[in-house]
Amino acid sequence: EILAVIVDNGAGKSTLIKALSGAVLPDEGEIRLDGKPVHFHSPIDARSAGIETVYQTLAMSPALSITDNMFMGREIRRPGVMGKWFRRLDRPAMEKFAREKLSELGLMTIQNINQAVETLSGGQRQGIAVARAAAFGSKVIILDEPTAALGVKEGRRVLELIQDVRSRGIPIILISHNMPHVFEVCDRIHIHRLGRRLTVIKPGDYSMADAVAFMTGAKLPEAAVEPA
């Protein structure tokens, strides 16, 4: 499913993302993955557990190629002595993997996967970031404002990409202030207020005005909080 998280400014969105992705250690409470408590001491721990995060800043290196950005920190080394001792990369294998993952998500309008990311449009960069997360995120993908600062056409393509990822069986946590997008693609909406979960609603049961009213405190939900 796609679970949206909507929050007002200063309600703890960034801290929540950092805790789930291993960037900060929670003071209390627990994180459960597949029903079991997990403890992340670094982003590497979260990634190893199958959690991938696409930050609003994308966390990409503009000067590096699409392939290099897909594998940043997870490069494939050549087999044998060249890889083990000389740390030579298996670039053909990396390029093949990158092409396959981009093609699976319909992103092969990008002709040269070795071109620098800085030459791509905003929507294409966002697509690469989502494809990278989908390639390595086996449990859940966290998307932080994926359509922010994009034009209408590029934003639409990213939404389609998110739905493609969902159709592959990968759960998505979508953090966004864009209510029309949230109500269009999400199955459930987690409403965060003053650092805590206020309620979880289904888009078909409430209006966008209701969601905003809950989020800002102008209105209190009648239903009890659903389980996460």
Predicted regions mapped to residue ranges:
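Glycine-rich phosphate-binding loops of nucleotide-dependent enzymes
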Residues: E1-A228
